[in-house]
Amino acid sequence: MPNHDYRELAAVFAGGALGALARAALSALAIPDPARWPWPTFTVNVVGAFLVGYFTTRLLERLPLSSYRRPLLGTGLCGGLTTFSTMQVETISMIEHGHWGLAAAYSVVSITLGLLAVHLATVLVRRVRIRR
């Protein structure tokens, strides 16, 4: 059995708890309606994509190695904040209620803006000069 670093698991847990709490707080602001754009899920997914792009690039290319930053911020915080599965459930609900155009737009825009957010964050991190 592999030897686990429980401090790394604790970092994932702590980051995941913060991300999930942020997502739950934002989701509580809107009542789900398959006839409307699901702004809470859309927002956390695009913001989370930007953050994971930022954290991944910054941690891998700009900061000294740390065994806890990436599990805390990437896997934990961003993993707890974002929710691809909820996006899928919302899309199916739109389809089941006959909102095919909204479902297609939501899927395409969510994935496209998520990819653009990761790319933008990566570009921004790489443009910032390291101060010494």
Curated annotation (Swiss-Prot):
Fluoride-specific ion channel. Important for reducing fluoride concentration in the cell, thus reducing its toxicity. GO terms for cellular component: plasma membrane. The keyword Magnesium does not apply. It is a multi-pass membrane protein. GO terms for biological process: cellular detoxification of fluoride; fluoride transmembrane transport. NCBIfam families: PRK14216.1. It comes from Mycobacterium tuberculosis (strain ATCC 25618 / H37Rv). This is Fluoride-specific ion channel FluC 1. Na(+) binds at residues 79, 82. Pfam families: CRCB (PF02537). The chain crosses the membrane at residues 11-31, 37-57, 70-92, 105-125. Keywords: Cell membrane, Ion channel, Ion transport, Membrane, Metal-binding, Sodium, Transmembrane, Transmembrane helix, Transport. GO terms for molecular function: fluoride channel activity; fluoride transmembrane transporter activity; metal ion binding. Belongs to the fluoride channel Fluc/FEX (TC 1.A.43) family. Its main location: membrane. Na(+) is not transported, but it plays an essential structural role and its presence is essential for fluoride channel function. It is found in: Cell membrane. It catalyses: fluoride(in) = fluoride(out).
